[in-house]
């Protein structure tokens, strides 16, 4: 896989991301992809070859390795990074689709705009971006669960005991470079959690921003209303109406006064 081309395509999403999205993209490429390419593959390498058990029984080492390492960390991380970065490419492709439609519209009509700004997060593009955030956060959460299912404590011990057939008895198996591997495991887990938080924060930011844009703005008084003397100087009845505690009874009778309360505290009634 050509990672440089993949990175170049994915970096185009920067133009349509918020500050949280740019931080997420930098975190993914600098702290996850580069660490995976430069160090993780070298640390794991031929992990099965370095898995050693104190027995000469043919097939025992392979069976024990498959029992304790059903899926390699490196393979899981590779699949996780591919799935996590794909939604960002969908956003770029959606923008490219809108620009192509805009260009075709200009060629056919010759004036006007199909989209006010093809790269602006509005309409379907906004939903595509929001769905991409949900998808990325969901993928990271699923892979965190998978790591926990395969390796309950996330970290690797230096020695494991195996008693699976065809091993003659319980044998001790030793994992190569356990401390170094645990450092990278914790690092990748922490960066995944940070990416999840960034996705959720960006999603919350976009929803709040959209709600504030859709909320009706308070209109200022018109010039005609300002020139109206009743608007600047309301009558005494209007002041009394606005400042008093009111009870809407919907009847023609006044409410009875309570004997244990003074008349000054009785609420006024609108007939």
UniProtKB/Swiss-Prot annotation:
Regions of this protein lying in the Extracellular compartment: 41-75, 148-182
Region (Disordered): 217-237
UniProt entry keywords in alphabetical sequence: Cell junction, Cell membrane, Gap junction, Membrane, Transmembrane, Transmembrane helix
Compartments where found: Cell membrane; Cell junction, Gap junction
Molecular functions (GO terms): gap junction channel activity
Bilayer topology annotation: Multi-pass membrane protein
GO cellular component labels: connexin complex
Residues that span the membrane, as ranges: 21-40, 76-98, 125-147, 183-205
Expression sites by tissue: Expressed in skin.
Positions on the Cytoplasmic side per record topology: 1-20, 99-124, 206-271
Swiss-Prot/TrEMBL GO biological process terms: cell-cell signaling; epididymis development; labyrinthine layer morphogenesis; spongiotrophoblast differentiation; trophoblast giant cell differentiation
Entry function: One gap junction consists of a cluster of closely packed pairs of transmembrane channels, the connexons, through which materials of low MW diffuse from one cell to a neighboring cell.
Subunit relationships: A connexon is composed of a hexamer of connexins.
Family stated for the protein in its record: Belongs to the connexin family. Beta-type (group I) subfamily.
Protein's recorded name: Gap junction beta-5 protein
Lineage per the UniProt record: Eukaryota, Metazoa, Chordata, Craniata, Vertebrata
């Amino acid at each position: 896989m050509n990672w440089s081309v993949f990175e170049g395509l994915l970096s185009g999403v920067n133009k349509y991301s918020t500050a949280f999205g740019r931080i997420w993209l930098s975190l993914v490429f600098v702290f996850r992809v580069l660490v995976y390419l430069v160090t993780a593959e070298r640390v794991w390498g031929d992990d099965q070859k370095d898995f050693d058990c104190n027995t000469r029984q043919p097939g025992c080492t392979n069976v024990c390795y498959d029992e304790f390492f059903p899926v390699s960390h490196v393979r899981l991380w590779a699949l996780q990074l591919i799935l996590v970065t794909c939604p960002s490419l969908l956003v770029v492709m959606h923008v490219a689709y809108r620009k192509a439609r805009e260009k075709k519209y200009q060629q056919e009509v010759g004036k006007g705009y199909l989209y006010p700004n093809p790269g602006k997060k509005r309409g379907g593009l906004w939903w595509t971006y929001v769905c991409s955030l949900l998808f990325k956060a969901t993928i990271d959460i699923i892979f965190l669960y998978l790591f926990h299912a395969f390796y309950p404590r996330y970290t690797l011990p230096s020695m494991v005991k195996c008693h699976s057939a065809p091993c003659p008895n319980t044998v001790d198996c030793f994992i190569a470079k356990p401390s170094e591997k645990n450092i990278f495991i914790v690092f990748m887990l922490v960066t995944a959690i940070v990416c999840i938080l960034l996705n959720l924060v960006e999603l919350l930011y976009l929803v709040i921003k959209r709600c504030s844009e859709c909320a009706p703005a308070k209109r200022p008084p018109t010039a005609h209303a300002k020139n109206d003397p009743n608007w600047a100087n309301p009558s005494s009845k209007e002041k009394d109406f606005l400042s008093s505690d009111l009870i809407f009874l919907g009847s023609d009778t006044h409410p009875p006064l309570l004997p244990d309360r003074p008349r000054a505290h009785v609420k006024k009634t609108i007939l």
